[in-house]
Amino acid sequence: MHLVAGDSPGSGPHLPATAFIIPASSATLGLPSSALDVSCFPREPIHVGAPEQVAGCEPVSATVLPQLSAGPASSSTSTVRLLEWTEAAAPPPGGGLRFRISEYKPLNMAGVEQPPSPELRQEGVTEYEDGGAPAGDGEAGPQQAEDHPQNPPEDPNQDPPEDDSTCQCQACGPHQAAGPDLGSSNDGCPQLFQERSVIVENSSGSTSASELLKPMKKRKRREYQSPSEEESEPEAMEKQEEGKDPEGQPTASTPESEEWSSSQPATGEKKECWSWESYLEEQKAITAPVSLFQDSQAVTHNKNGFKLGMKLEGIDPQHPSMYFILTVAEVCGYRLRLHFDGYSECHDFWVNANSPDIHPAGWFEKTGHKLQPPKGYKEEEFSWSQYLRSTRAQAAPKHLFVSQSHSPPPLGFQVGMKLEAVDRMNPSLVCVASVTDVVDSRFLVHFDNWDDTYDYWCDPSSPYIHPVGWCQKQGKPLTPPQDYPDPDNFCWEKYLEETGASAVPTWAFKVRPPHSFLVNMKLEAVDRRNPALIRVASVEDVEDHRIKIHFDGWSHGYDFWIDADHPDIHPAGWCSKTGHPLQPPLGPREPSSASPGGCPPLSYRSLPHTRTSKYSFHHRKCPTPGCDGSGHVTGKFTAHHCLSGCPLAERNQSRLKAELSDSEASARKKNLSGFSPRKKPRHHGRIGRPPKYRKIPQEDFQTLTPDVVHQSLFMSALSAHPDRSLSVCWEQHCKLLPGVAGISASTVAKWTIDEVFGFVQTLTGCEDQARLFKDEARIVRVTHVSGKTLVWTVAQLGDLVCSDHLQEGKGILETGVHSLLCSLPTHLLAKLSFASDSQY
C-alpha cells in the first residue's frame, strides 16, 4: 500500500513505504492451496501521483494481501519470513517502517527505521520453543492474550523515573530517552530481545498466520537437584504456577539465575558475585604486589596445554628421589591433578603446569635416572612405546614442560658432596646431608643414613642449606648421621675421610634476601587440607623466608607456615586470569552446610545425582561451616558427608593420609624395586634429633588393667557404650540366646577352660572349633611364651570370637576370653601390648 502524508494530493511525489498487513486469521482470506515462496511475489510497482479520492476527501489506500498458504505443503513458508528480523526490530523489505516484538505485545509498529546505537547491538539470537500466549496484530485488539496484560506490572520496589522523558530498562538498568521510535525502554533493550525471539517453524494445516507470531516463553533450564528435592512433573508445574506474581506474570529473573552453575548449591540459592575489588574496599586492605612473587607463582603467558589422559614422568612428593609414571587425571585452570599409574587415587597430587617436578616421557632414559614402572610391570621390561600402545594413551608433548628449558646446573654442587642442611620437618635441627641428584638448576638434599622421605629439592640460594662447618661457627649443634659410632665426637674432617667424599665449596652457596611480604597482605593460596581448592588468604605472620597463611573467614586453627617462594601461593587475581575457581572468604553470616537440602556440589564439574538413588546417607551434608563436601581427610575420596571425613574439621587436624591407607601404601612400597628402606637400630646418645621411624610406646604397663585390654580388643559390637559394665553386655547377649537366660555373667566369668570348651561344643555342635579354643587358651597360660607367639595366640582367639559360626554365642565367648585374660600375670599383659605395637 502507499502511505499518503496528507489529504491533499500535492504536486510532488510522495516517498513510498511498503508494509504488510497480517490478518488475524487466514481463514478469512482466499488463500491458494499451492505453496508459494514469499520472495517470489513481485513487489507492487510504485505509482507516483495522487492517490484515489473518495467522498469526504479521505485518502483510500489500496490493500495488498500477500498470498499465504496454510496447507500442509507450505512447510517452508511462514509469515515470519515476510519481515527481516535484524536485532530488536524487523523492517519490511525496502520500507522504513519497523515492527518490534515487545514483552507484552507480540507485534507492534515501532516507527520509522533508525540505525540502532552501537551499545544496543548484540550478536546472536536465542531460539525459544513454542508454547506462548495467543498473539494479536500490531494494534491491541481482542486477540490480546488473557494472561498477558496490556501494560507491564508496576514494581513497587522500583524507583519511578526522574521525569517523563526518561525511563529505565527493567533488565539492563540504564536510562534512555523515551520516544516513538524506541517505544519503551524495555522494547529497545537487546537483552530482553534476545530473551523474546521467535523461531520459524513449519506451519500445519490448522496453523493460522497469527499463531505463527506468538511470543515464546523462554523455558527456564531446570536446575539439577538431589533426588530428595526432585518432584514429579505435576508438582513441578504447580510450583511453576506459584512462582508467578498475582497478575499472572512470572517473577523477575536474570540470565544468571536461569543458567545452571555447578558451583551453586542444589537448593537453587544464588550467591552474590565476589570480586577482589569490592572485597579489598570493604576490608580496607591491600594485596601483595606481584613483584614479591617468583615467576613460578605469578601469572604466566603460556596456556595450560595438558589434556586429560596424557602420560608423563614426575617426582613422587612423598619420595622426592623417585620418578614415577603419571597420568593427567584433572585439569583445572593452570593446575593439574596427577595420578600414579597402577595405584589408588588416594596418592594423587596437584601441581602447577609449569612445575619443574614433571618431565616428558623418556626423560629418565636421556638423563640416566631410574623410573619406577607402573604396578604390575617389571623395570627391565618396561618400554614407553609399548606402554602407550597397550594403554592407548598419549604422551604429553615436550613443549608443555618448563623443565625443557635446559637451565645450567648449579656451580659447585655435584652428586656425593657433603653439606649441612636443615631438616624441613624439624626446622630446629641441622643435620649432615649429601647431594644425591642434580637436575637443571636444582639439586636433591639427602640426609645421610635416613630414608628418602625427608629429602627435598632446592637451589644454591636456599636458606635451608649451609656449608660444612656452619654449625660450629654459629654455635649450634649438628646432628650426625644415623648409626654414627661416636655421635658426641663427630668431626667433619674424619667423616669426609671415612666416606671419601668432599664438601661443597663455600663460594657455591648463594645468599637469598628476605622477602618483602607484610602482615595483612592479601593473596591466593592452595588449601593444604583440600589441595583442589584455592582460597582467599592473608599474611598472618612473617619470618625472613617464610610467611604464615590465614584463610579469610576461617579459624586460625587452619593457619600454616609456608615458604615465600612456594608454588602454592599466588598474587590476587591469579585464579581469574588462569581460569581456576577461587573460594571466597567464609562470611560471618554464611549458613552452615548442614542446612536442609540435597547433596552438596562436590566440585565445579559435579553432575546431578540420579533420581533412583536409594542411599539416604549420601544426601547428608558436612556440618562444618563453609565446607561444600569436597575432599576427604584421608585423601582417598573426592567427597565426604560427615564430620569424620571433613578435611576442614578442627578435630581432624592431626590425622594423616597414611594412617588410613597403610595397606595401599605398603603394597606400593613393596613394588618399588629400587627402594628398600634400611633397618635402623635405635641410636642412643645422639643430639636432639627425633627418630624418623615409629617409636615403640613406652607406657607404664602396670596401668594396663584387664578391663582396659578387654574393652580395647574384645568389647562386643552390640554394646554401644563401651564404658558399661560387663553384666549389662551379658544381658544384651542373653536376648540372643534364650537357652542361657538363667546363667549370670558372674558365673561365666568364673568358668574354666574346660567349661568354655563344653559351651562352645554345645553351641556350635562342632568339636574341632571347641578344641581349637581349648588348645589356644592353654597356650596362653604358658608363662614363658614369647611376645610374638602371645600376639599370634590372642589373634587366633580373636578370629575364633569373630567366627561366623559363633556369632550367636559371641558374648559368652568374649566373656570367657575376658576371664582368661584376667587370669594372666601382669608381665604377660605387658608382653601382649609390647608385641602388638612391635608387630603392627
UniProtKB/Swiss-Prot annotation:
Localization annotation: Nucleus
Pfam family, one: MBT
Comp. bias intervals (Polar residues): 200-210, 250-266
Domain of life, source organism: Eukaryota
Site-annotated residues for Mediates recognition of monomethylated and dimethylated peptides: D423
UniProt site (Positioned at the entrance of MBT 2 and is required for recognition of monomethylated and dimethylated peptides): N426
ZnF CCHHC-type: positions: 613-656
Positions of MBT repeats: 274-374, 382-481, 490-585
Tissue expression summary: Widely expressed. Expression is reduced in colorectal cancer cell line SW480 and promyelocytic leukemia cell line HL-60.
Region (Disordered): 127-269, 580-605, 657-697
Biased composition regions of type Basic and acidic residues, renumbered to the chain: 236-247
Record text on subunit structure and interactions: Homodimer. Interacts with RB1/RB (when monomethylated at 'Lys-860'). Interacts with p53/TP53 (when monomethylated at 'Lys-382'). Interacts with CBX3, ETV6, KMT5A and VCP/p97.
Note: The L3MBTL1 locus is imprinted. Paternal inherited gene is expressed, while the maternal inherited gene is silenced.
Domain topic, free-text comment: The MBT repeat 2 specifically recognizes and binds monomethylated and dimethylated proteins. In contrast, it does not bind trimethylated proteins. The MBT repeat 1 does not bind methylated peptides but inserts a proline ring in a Pro-Ser-Ser/Thr sequence context.
Protein name per UniProt: Lethal(3)malignant brain tumor-like protein 1
Organism this protein belongs to: Homo sapiens
Recorded name of the encoding gene: L3MBTL1
